[in-house]
Amino acid sequence: MAFPAPAFSLANLLNGSYGVDTPEDVERLRSEQREEAAAACRNYRPLPAVDVSESVTEDAHSLRTPDGAPAEAVSDEFVTYGAEDYLEKSDDELLVAFETMVKPMRIGQLWCPAFNKCSFISSIAMARALLLAPRTSHRTMKCFEDLVAAIYTKSDFYYSEECEADDAQIDISSRDVPGYSFEPWSRTSGFEPPPICEACDMIMYQCPCFDFNALKKSCAERTFADDYVIEGLDGVVDNATLLSNLGPFLVPVKCQYEKCPTPTIAIPPDLNRATDRVDINLVQSICDSTLPTHSNYDDSFHQVFVESADYSIDLDHVRLRQSDLIAKIPDSGHMIPVLNTGSGHKRVGTTKEVLTAIKKRNADVPELGDSVNLSRLSKAVAERFFISYINGNSLASSNFVNVVSNFHDYMEKWKSSGLSYDDLPDLHAENLQFYDHMIKSDVKPVVSDTLNIDRPVPATITYHKKSITSQFSPLFTALFERFQRCLRERIILPVGKISSLEMAGFDVKNKHCLEIDLSKFDKSQGEFHLLIQEHILNGLGCPAPITKWWCDFHRFSYIRDRRAGVGMPISFQRRTGDAFTYFGNTIVTMAEFAWCYDTDQFEKLLFSGDDSLGFSLLPPVGDPSKFTTLFNMEAKVMEPAVPYICSKFLLSDEFGNTFSVPDPLREVQRLGTKKIPYSDNDEFLFAHFMSFVDRLKFLDRMSQSCIDQLSIFFELKYKKSGEEAALMLGAFKKYTANFQSYKELYYSDRRQCELINSFCSTEFRVERVNSNKQRKKYGIERRCNDKRRTPTGSYGGGEEAETKVSQTESTGTRSQKSQRESAFKSQTVPLPTVLSSRWFGTDRVMPPCERGGVTRA
C-alpha cells in the first residue's frame, strides 16, 4: 500500500513530518527495491550452452551459463539473499561499491560504464547465484567482485586460459593496458593550503619576511620550462591564477612532463638567449621592410644626368671662373657593397654640383625674425645664458690652461700633411675674410622614405687654411674646456675629455623629453647671433681684442671653390669648417633655449651643436615660437619626444645608469656605403671595420630591458616596427665579431687570383718557346742577325727564354707587390702549367697562348 507523501505546509514543516523519512517510508522503499530486483532476476534468461574449443573465441557480448546448468531461472531465495545487503545501503555507499567491483573508467565527470542502480543490484544477485550453482565446467570462475563486473559489462565469467596455465589469477577486466595506468579518482576540493613562514608562523603572503619581488625575479630568471619539457596539458591555468590561491574554484590541472637531458656543454647565462641566425639575406630583408624606397635606389649615373642636362639656378652675387678648373683626380676604385641600403656614391665637386649645394646651404637666407634692438636684447640673452648655465664661483676661480700644449698637439696632428712651424703666416698680413669652400663627398644617410622623389644634396664646408686654423684652434679649445668646467651639474656637453653621454645614476625612464629640431641652422644666423656670441666670449674670459677681431671678419666674407670655379660673398652666417664652428653653434643653441624655456624645470639638459635634449619630471613649459620670431630659426618641437640626440638613443640599464646607442637605422645604411677605397691588403676596409666596432661597443651592455626600450623609442621616432631594431642588433653583433664576417658585406669587381701551392720545391722554372708564325702575326719577327737584346718580360719574344724565379727574385714589374705574389714566388710547380701574364703585372690583355707562346714547366 502506497502512502501519500505529506503535503508542504507550515504545520507539517514545524512538526517535522515534511522532508523527513519515517520508518514506514523506509520500509516501503526497501520493499519496492526488493520487488524490482526479483523482477529483474525472473526476467533474465541466459543463452543455451555452447561448446567452446580452444581455437574459437567467445562472443564478448554474449552471456551463457556453465555446461549442465539448469535452464530454469535462479530461485528467488538466492536473489533475496544476494540483494538484501545492498538494498539497505545508501546511494553513496552503492557508488563506492560500484567503483570497487566494476572499476569504471572516469572520463572527465563521466563513468564508463555508467552507474545503474537496478543493473548493479541484479549483477550482484546473479553473481551470488552463479557461485552457489553446481560446478560443471572445468574452467575457473572469477571471484565475486570480478564476476559482478563481468555480469555488469556482459563479458566472460571465467578467467583466461593463459592465466590458468601460469597458475596466476589475473584480472583481465582491470584494464592494465601497456603504457597506461588507471586509478580511481578521488574527489578533492582543489584547495591548496598556503605556505607558512617558519620564522613568524604566518602565511607567507602576509608575513614581513616574504619577499614577493624576489620570488618574481627568481621565477623570471629560471622557469619550470628550463628543466622540464611539457608533453601534454589537459588544461591551462596561468601563474597569476595559481598564485592567487582561489582554493576550491581552481580546476585541477593534469600535466605530463619529461625530464630534459643534462646538457653536455654549459652555456653562460648571458648567452642563453634564443636568437635567429643572421645572414646577409636577413639584413637585406630588414632594409627592404624598414626603408622601402632605399632598396631599389641606385645613383650611379645621377651626377652624369645633372652634368649633361639643362641647368637653371637663381643666385645673387655669384662669380664663375671656368678657365682654371682642377680636373678630377682618378682614384683606384671603391669596394662594392652587397647590401643595398640607399647609400649614394661619392659626389664630385663640379660646377653644377657646387652651385646646387650653395643654393641649399648658403644662399636664400630666411628672414623670419622681427625687428628688435640688437644691442640691448643681445646683452639680455647673454645674461640669461650665464644665469641659467654657468656657476659663477667656478668661472671666477678658473683660468686658461693648456693653450700652448694644444697648439703643439695640433701641429703634431697635421705634421704628416706638411704643416710645419716655418709655414705659419702672420695673421695681420692675411685677409681672414677669404674662406675656401668645398662640398662633402659623403652624403648623410637619409632616413625618410623620399629617395624615390628627392635627390639628397651634399653639405658644404667653409674653412680657413690649416696654417690659419692652427693659430685660433688652441685658444678656442682651451676656452671650451674652461666653459665645460664652469657649467652647472645638470648641463652636459657630450664632447671632450671631461664629458660624454654616459650618465651614471640617471634614469631616462618615466621622464618627459623635450627635443627641438632647428632647420637651416648655419645660414639662419645673423648679426643678432654674432652679438650674442661676442658677449658670451667676453664673459667667459676670452681677450676682448681677439673676440672683436674674430667677429669682425665674420660679418662679411667671401667664399670660393677653386675646383669648381665658383665664388660668392656671404655675411654673418656660420662658417662650417673654422676653429669656432662647434663651440659657436653650441652656445647659440644654449642661449636660444634658455630664452625660450626656464632651465630650472629640467633635471638634465644636453647640448651638442644644433642638437638639444631636456629631461623633466613634469611636462616642460615654454614658448618655442620665439625660436622663429626672435632668433630667425625654423624650429620644430619633436612629438612624440624620445631621448635622442646626436643620432643616438639614450637607454638606461637595470642599475639606473644611462648610456648611448647609435641609431640602428643609420648604422644599417652605413653597412652599404660605397665610399670605401679599394686596396690589395684591405687596409681601408679594415679601418672602416674598426670604426664600426668602436661605434657599437655598447652591444655588451644591451640586456633584454634595454632592447625593449630601444624598440619602443625606435617605433615612436620613425613610426616603424620596433622588432626590426632588435633584428638589427643581431646583425651588428655578428659583423662586429671579426673582420672576416665584416668582409662578407663588400666585394670588388677587380679580378683577384689566389695562387695556392703545397709543393716544397725550392725553385720554379718557366721555359717559353715562341713560334715564328705567331711572332709574325703580332709584328715581332726579327732577323737572325739582329743583335738587339730580347726583352725579358713575361712573354717578350725571342727564340727561347729561360726564367728562374726564386724566393729572392721579383716576378713582375709592379711597384707594390701583393701577398699573393710573395706566396707565388716561394713555391714551385713541377707539373705542366699555363701562367697568365696578368698575374705578373706585365700584360693585362691577352693570355700567353694568344701571344704565340708555349709554356711548359
Curated annotation (Swiss-Prot):
PROSITE patterns: RDRP_SSRNA_POS. It holds the Pfam family RdRP_2. Residues 780-829 are annotated as: Disordered. GO terms for biological process: DNA-templated transcription; positive stranded viral RNA replication. It comes from the Viruses. It catalyses: RNA(n) + a ribonucleoside 5'-triphosphate = RNA(n+1) + diphosphate. Keywords: Nucleotide-binding, Nucleotidyltransferase, RNA-directed RNA polymerase, Transferase, Viral RNA replication. Its EC number is 2.7.7.48. Residues 511-624 form the RdRp catalytic domain. Residues 804-816 have a biased composition (Polar residues). InterPro entries: Bromoviridae_RdRp (IPR047309), DNA/RNA_pol_sf (IPR043502), RNA-dep_RNA_pol_alsuvir (IPR001788), RNA-dir_pol_PSvirus (IPR007094). One of its GO terms (molecular function) is RNA binding. RNA-dependent RNA polymerase which replicates the viral genome composed of 3 RNA segments, RNA1, RNA2 and RNA3. This is RNA-directed RNA polymerase 2a. It comes from Cucumber mosaic virus (strain Y). The lineage of its organism: Viruses, Riboviria, Orthornavirae, Kitrinoviricota, Alsuviricetes.
